[in-house]
Amino acid sequence: MAENTNDSAVLETEEELTSYTTETNAGAGTGTSTIAPGYGTGRRKEAVARVRLVPGTGKWTINGRTLEEYFPAKLLQREVNSPIVLLKLEGKFDAIVLVDGGGTTGQAGAIRLGVARALNAIDRDANRAALKKAGFLTRDARVVERKKAGLHKARRAPQFSKR
C-alpha cells in the first residue's frame, strides 16, 4: 500500500515538470488588443524610424506620403504592415511615421520594428507574446562590414600570384 502512494506522488511530480514551460503562449490574447495611442522607435542598418500609432482607419503617413507612394514595392509594404496583420488589427490604427537614413529595405525594417514596439507599448499583455514569437521585437543587428586596408572590399583580397 505504501508503494501506491509513492508512485502517485512521483507521477504528480512528473506531470508538473512536463507541463512547465518557459515559453509564453503566443496565441493568448490575440485580437483582444486595446485601442489606444502608442509610440515606438525602430532601427535597421543606417535607418531610424519614429512611429506613432493612433486609433483610426488604417491610414499610413510616411514622411508626409502614403504607404503606396513611399514603398511602391508590395514586398516592402507587406513587411511594414506585418505586425498589424499578425495581431489582426488592420484598419484600427493610423500610422504616422518619420524615417530617415539608409535605403528602402533598411527603412522598411526600421518601420516594422517601430510599429511592433508601438503595438507592444499599447497593450503589453495581449500583444507581446505573439510579436516576440514572430521575431518582430528583435532588432536586426546586421550591418555592412567595414573595408579593411590592403583589401579591395571588406573581404575581397587582391589576386594572389604564387610566382
Swiss-Prot record:
GO MF terms held by the record: RNA binding; structural constituent of ribosome
Compositional bias per record (Low complexity), positions renumbered to this chain: 18-38
Entry keyword annotation includes Ribonucleoprotein: yes
Domain of life per record: Bacteria
PROSITE patterns: RIBOSOMAL_S9 (PS00360)
An individual GO BP term: translation
Record flagged with keyword Zinc-finger: no
Matching InterPro entries: Ribosomal_Su5_D2-typ_SF (IPR020568), Ribosomal_uS9 (IPR000754), Ribosomal_uS9_bac/plastid (IPR023035), Ribosomal_uS9_CS (IPR020574), Ribsml_uS5_D2-typ_fold_subgr (IPR014721)
Transmembrane region(s): none
Gene Ontology CC annotations of this record: cytoplasm; small ribosomal subunit
SUPFAM superfamilies xref list: Ribosomal protein S5 domain 2-like (SSF54211)
Keyword annotations of the record: Ribonucleoprotein, Ribosomal protein
Region (Disordered): 1-41
Family per similarity comment: Belongs to the universal ribosomal protein uS9 family.
UniProt cross-references to PANTHER family, sorted A to Z: RIBOSOMAL PROTEIN S9, SMALL RIBOSOMAL SUBUNIT PROTEIN US9M
Protein name listed in UniProt: Small ribosomal subunit protein uS9
Biological source species: Bifidobacterium adolescentis (strain ATCC 15703 / DSM 20083 / NCTC 11814 / E194a)
Taxonomic lineage of the native organism: Bacteria, Bacillati, Actinomycetota, Actinomycetes, Bifidobacteriales
